[in-house]
Amino acid sequence: MNKRNFIPLVNYKEYSPEEMVRRSKDFYEDIKQRRTVRHFSNKSVPEEVIKNCLRAAGTAPSGANLQPWQFVVVSDIKIKKEIRLGAEKEEKEFYSKRAPKEWLDALKPLGTNEIKTFLEEAPYLIAIFSKSYDVLPNGEKIKQYYPLESVGIACGILIAAIHNAGLVSLTHTPSPMDFLNEILDRPKNERPFLLLVIGYPAKDAKVPDIKKKNLKEIVSFI
């Protein structure tokens, strides 16, 4: 029988209702300023900032606490070039052959295309992989539970942490992303989930004039 090991919840802090409203509003007012950026400066970012953001991502809840994620941080110029070439190859196929007209129409307001200069311009790329199973040092395979949901939550925390640090990001998902396994030498049990582009915005960076749905459109109270 497995022994359950529990410890007291000591770090929880309760706030007054008024303080909770203030804190939640402050967080919303800050996070709503976050924007997806496609034009990056090549200004360097302290590596410790990236590490701290990844530490935050690693606190995410996961199925059975198995933490089925792997983050690969890329700053090497040659590797970024390889990733760009791999991504643009898939994106060219997507825009010219694979994507249905409805999808391309939906993308038009965002001004996207198969050219991905940001993959070389930004100081950091983080390739995020999900694990369908983990492999112990002795070769034993351990099934992972809810890997996609778990990794998605971790990515959300990571994106919020990056914004909180004063940086901008872009979620990039060329399909398929198998080329990342080859370029980054990742094992078969790791599947590319997301490529996150991170850095400072270019001085002339522009973003689409888009709006988010309001609360009534996305929430039902029962």
Identify the residue ranges that each predicted region occupies:
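N-terminal accessory segments that position/regulate proteins before the catalytic core
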Residues: 1-37, 41-47, 51, 82-85
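C-terminal helix-cap and adjacent tail motif
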Residues: 2-23, 113, 194-222
